[in-house]
Regions:
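Bacterial N-terminal signal peptides that target proteins for export
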Residues: 1-8
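Bacterial N-terminal signal peptides
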Residues: 8-17
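Sec/Tat signal peptide C-region and signal peptidase I cleavage site
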Residues: 18-22
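Early extracytoplasmic/domain-onset interaction patches
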Residues: 23-61, 140
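Juxtacatalytic substrate-recognition/specificity segment
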Residues: 44, 223-350
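Non-catalytic architectural context of zinc metalloproteases
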Residues: 45, 68-77, 81-270, 288-291
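Post-HExxH zinc-binding segment in Zn-dependent metallohydrolases
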Residues: 292, 299, 306, 331-332, ...
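C-terminal recognition in membrane/secretory proteostasis and scaffolding
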Residues: 362-363, 371-612
Length: 612
């Protein structure tokens, strides 16, 4: 239930700690009522702090995003006041930290937060997008912690424009969780509570005009559902049309994913969960990549408004990936990934486990539980191989552990290896365990054991990770580790696929597309692809195929012409010039399929991985 408060009055009174809070309490008010200048005003009233000096710390990075951001760079007009509303002396110590000399005199702090979503050095879903018709923020972009006390409780009031709705996964101050979505998203001053800074920082926010207030440039559409013992909210902020008609289908597939993964772990590590989706139309899609970010009981997404076939193919694995993170990384993680130090860059060797194993299960569980056909999973394996082949040569020279430690690994060029080489190594690891134990053990058993330990608050030291894999699987993995995780040996994927009765995957060359200025852009393409053979190159804008302008509604149909025609004419734009280029297709020569005489063990292993 939303508890409405008179924010101005609260800012001038002493705030008492709600039950369960630590000694300090922070009461924030975020004013979204005037965002024409692409910034929001934040007011903070601290209570219960006794230091002679006080500090305010914005985070260096956001959990799940890993890359260094320095959120303090987007803070302006930082001021502190005493009870007479006189300004106090403030010294900015670095990008993210402010010191207030008279700590005991501080009654209020104010600052502005600038829009940061267009900073291409950071991930969209870790930043803040502040506009007159929409608001999205990862909480690390808005809030810091006071007096170095990350255990202090917090309350947040969001002051909204008339007719707006806001979604946030935090509790109401009463402790009531999501009693009624129509009330919880009430447009007037929604109010939330966090028990500590970790909880506050892990709660993303989206807000926009309500759909029933009339068609706007952006609007928010919500649905709710129950699955098992938990409640789920789905909130989509969009200026497109896809979700108007497809929300019920979206909820159906989200429920299927939730069922699959909670059934897999026999575990639901939350009471409620929120899916927050920012879905721009094609013409308003930022030029940088789509994606998502996991949180303790929510996930947020930047996913373009599109046709349903494209949505099912491209986005269901993304939802599956972020949801699996509830176990693998939010609960199962090394000591370096929690409790968090928001002032230091994380130097962990285990991101290959957090991202690569998660990406593997995101796809294999969709197949295992019948959400996608098994053949789709094998196509995913083929796609991972193509993506890995297109990674920069310098990145290929690094092991998965080196990429994990390397700060630049979350640059898009290198990050692709976490989501291509990473799941391939996870598949190979699963097959290694299954084949050497006659399918008595698997990577599933390893993840179950990690989860059982993590339920009781046990993290693992980085140096203990592989020994724990060996303990839980019952086999020596030193050679596998030295070659494919610590080392950079070529991945013998075909050899491992044979362990589950699969022949070599077909390869016709891969293409990676981006979006800019309302056009599809070739980000990269395999040299074996027909487009590359015809002379197209990275950076070209794809305008039309056989004279028909490309759009989200027809790109699948036009791309499928390669199956029925021997050639097409592709219109591109390069260096400001438009040209038509003939493209000739050839059929893949290496087929994909089931081994004609798979062993009984291979059949059993295949069933264990993809269900049939």
């Amino acid at each position: 239930m939303i508890i409405r408060r008179v924010a101005v009055a609260l800012l001038l009174t002493i705030v008492f700690a709600p039950a369960g809070f630590a000694r300090g309490v922070l009461k924030f008010t975020v004013d979204l009522r005037d965002t024409k200048s692409h910034q929001v005003h934040v007011t903070l009233v601290p209570s219960g702090f006794q230091g002679h000096t006080a500090t305010y710390q914005m985070p260096l990075w956001a959990p799940g995003a890993y890359s260094v951001t320095h959120y303090g760079r987007y803070v302006r007009n930082f001021k502190a006041f005493n009870k007479w509303h006189h300004t106090l002396a403030v010294k900015q110590l670095n990008d993210d930290r402010w010191q207030i000399a008279s700590g005991q005199s501080v009654k209020k702090i104010e600052y502005d937060v600038l829009d940061s979503h267009s900073d291409t050095s950071s991930l969209y879903f870790a930043m803040a997008n502040i506009d007159t018709s929409l608001f999205f923020a990862n909480a690390t972009a808005l809030f810091g912690y006071y007096d170095d006390d990350k255990n202090a409780g917090a309350e947040v009031i969001y002051q909204l424009p008339d007719g707006w709705k806001l979604e946030c996964p935090l509790d109401a101050p009463s402790g009531t969780r999501k009693p009624d979505p129509s009330h919880r998203s009430h447009p007037t001053d929604p109010n939330f509570m966090a028990r500590n800074y970790d909880e506050l920082a892990d709660a993303p926010i989206i807000a926009a005009p309500m759909i029933d207030s009339g068609r706007a440039s952006n609007r928010i559409i919500t649905r709710s559902f129950q699955e098992g013992s938990a409640d789920y909210d789905v909130a989509v902020m969009t200026d497109g049309t896809f979700y108007d008609s497809e929300m019920d289908s979206l909820v159906y597939y989200l429920r299927e994913i939730v069922h699959a993964e909670t059934d897999f772990f026999h575990d639901t590590p939350y009471k409620d969960y929120t899916f927050e989706i920012t879905a721009p139309s094609f013409s308003h899609m930022p030029s940088f990549a789509q994606g998502a970010l996991e949180h303790a009981n929510s996930s947020d997404y930047l996913l373009m408004d599109m046709s349903w076939p494209l949505f099912k193919r491209e986005f269901l694995p993304i939802f599956s990936h972020e949801f699996f993170h509830l176990w693998n990384v939010k609960r199962i993680h090394s000591t370096l990934l929690g409790p968090f130090d928001y002032t230091q860059r994380v130097m962990t060797k285990s991101l290959w486990m957090a991202e690569g194993i998660t990406e593997y299960y995101a796809h294999t569980l969709l197949a295992r539980y019948g959400i996608i056909p098994p053949e789709r999973f094998y196509q995913d394996v083929s796609d991972w191989r193509k993506e890995m082949a297109m990674a920069p040569e310098e990145a290929k020279k690094k092991s998965l552990e080196e990429l994990s430690i390397d700060e630049s690994a979350f640059d898009m060029d290198e990050a692709t290896l976490f989501y291509s080489r990473g799941p391939l190594v996870a598949l190979m690891l699963d097959l290694e365990i299954r084949s050497r134990t006659n399918n008595k053990k698997s990577l599933d058993d390893v993840m179950f054991a990690f989860n059982d330990a993590a339920k009781h608050g046990k993290t693992f030291r980085e140096e203990d990770m592989i020994p724990l894999f060996e303990k839980y699987s019952g086999i020596d993995l030193s050679d596998f580790y030295n070659r494919y995780i610590h080392g950079t040996d070529s991945l013998p994927v075909d050899t491992y696929l044979a362990m589950m009765g699969r022949a070599r995957a077909a390869s016709s060359g891969s293409v990676s597309l981006g979006f800019s200025g309302g056009n599809f852009i070739l980000n990269s393409l395999d040299t074996t692809n027909a487009l590359a053979r015809a002379g197209l190159k990275a950076g070209d804008a794809l305008i039309a195929i056989n004279g028909t302008k490309l759009s989200l509604d027809n790109i699948d149909r036009l791309a499928a012409l390669k199956d029925s025609l021997s050639s097409v004419s592709v219109t591109i734009e390069r260096d400001g010039k438009t040209m038509d280029i003939p493209v000739t297709f050839t059929k893949p020569t290496n087929g994909q399929g089931v081994d004609p005489v798979p062993s009984p063990l291979a059949i059993e292993i295949r069933k264990g991985i993809v269900g049939q």
